[in-house]
UniProtKB/Swiss-Prot annotation:
PANTHER family: NADH UBIQUINONE OXIDOREDUCTASE SUBUNIT ND6, NADH-UBIQUINONE OXIDOREDUCTASE CHAIN 6. Disulfide bonds: none annotated. The chain crosses the membrane at residues 1-21, 23-43, 47-67, 86-106, 133-153. Pfam families: Oxidored_q3. One of its GO terms (cellular component) is mitochondrial membrane. InterPro entries: ComplexI_Subunit6, NADH_UbQ/plastoQ_OxRdtase_su6, Nuo/plastoQ_OxRdtase_6_NuoJ. It comes from Polypterus ornatipinnis. Core subunit of the mitochondrial membrane respiratory chain NADH dehydrogenase (Complex I) that is believed to belong to the minimal assembly required for catalysis. Complex I functions in the transfer of electrons from NADH to the respiratory chain. The immediate electron acceptor for the enzyme is believed to be ubiquinone. This is NADH-ubiquinone oxidoreductase chain 6. Its EC number is 7.1.1.2. Belongs to the complex I subunit 6 family. GO terms for molecular function: NADH dehydrogenase (ubiquinone) activity. It is found in: Mitochondrion membrane. The lineage of its organism: Eukaryota, Metazoa, Chordata, Craniata, Vertebrata.
C-alpha cells in the first residue's frame, strides 16, 4: 500500500512536470517517468503482462515522436527547471491539484487494500485475453500508428526532402 502511494505521488509530479512544459526535452522526460510509474502501479495491482506491454508500446512510440520533436522545434536556449516562469507554472498546477483534492476527494472513503478495488478485474486481464480477443486490433493499431507517423513527417517537411526519400 505504501508503494502505491509513492507511485501515485510520483505520477502526480510527472504530470505536473509535463504540464509546466519548459522545453520538449524535459516534457519527454516527464512523460517517460509518468509511463514508468503508471505501469508500476499496474504491476502492483497484479497486471504484470499488461503493464509490460503498455510500457514497451508507449515508450517505443515516445522514442520515435520525441526523436523528431526536438529536431523540428530545437531551441538554442531552452527553459530549464530552475527558471522562474517554470517554477510559477509548477506552483499554479500544485495549487490546482490541492484545490481539486479538497473539493472532490476530501469526503471520499479510501480503500484499505488494493485488492478491494482491483480484485475482480485481475482474472480478465491476461496474455490469452489480449491476443485472443484483441489480437487483430493490436495489429491494426500498429499499422495505423506507423501510417500516422509517416503522414505527419511528410506534412511537416515542407519543400525539403522528406522521410520517404530514395537513398
Amino acid at each position: 500500500m505504501v508503494l502505491m502511494v509513492v507511485f501515485s505521488v510520483m505520477f502526480l509530479i510527472s504530470l505536473i512536470a509535463v504540464a509546466s512544459n519548459p522545453s520538449p526535452y524535459f516534457a519527454a522526460f516527464g512523460l517517460m517517468v509518468g509511463a514508468g510509474v503508471g505501469c508500476g502501479m499496474l504491476m502492483q495491482c497484479g497486471m504484470t503482462f499488461l503493464s509490460m506491454i503498455l510500457f514497451l508500446i508507449y515508450l517505443g512510440g515516445m522514442l520515435v515522436v520525441f526523436a523528431y520533436s526536438p529536431a523540428l522545434a530545437a531551441e538554442p536556449y531552452p527553459n530549464a527547471w530552475g527558471s522562474w516562469e517554470v517554477f510559477s507554472y509548477v506552483l499554479v498546477y500544485m495549487f490546482l491539484v490541492i484545490v481539486a483534492w479538497v473539493a472532490f476527494v476530501g469526503d471520499m472513503e479510501l480503500f484499505d487494500d488494493v485488492e478491494e478495488y482491483f480484485g475482480a478485474m485481475r482474472r480478465y486481464v491476461g496474455v490469452a485475453e489480449v491476443y485472443n480477443a484483441g489480437g487483430y486490433m493490436l495489429f491494426i493499431a500498429g499499422w495505423v500508428l506507423l501510417m500516422a507517423l509517416l503522414v505527419v513527417l511528410e506534412l511537416t517537411r515542407g519543400y525539403s526532402r522528406g522521410c520517404l526519400r530514395a537513398v
